[in-house]
Amino acid sequence: MKASDLQTLRHAIDGTDEAITALLATRRKLSHQIIALKARDGVPPLDVVREAEIRRRYDLMARGSGSVAHAILNWCRRHA
């Protein structure tokens, strides 16, 4: 293995980590906007139909990524 190959892969991981972090921050911001909109309009915070849709989507994503999709969903729930 060449040092340049290792550096290239590490750089790719660093870029991926930055992208993941930015995407999660964007998702969190959108979630806060939804929470505020629901509060403003007097809409209950929990929509069981939407939550079921989200769970189904993450279950489908988990088929290809193992527990990663569920870990992301759980993180999003804890940090909303």
Listing of model-derived features with the role each one plays in the protein:
Residues 1-80:
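Domain-level signature for soluble enzymes in the chorismate/prephenate branch of the shikimate pathway
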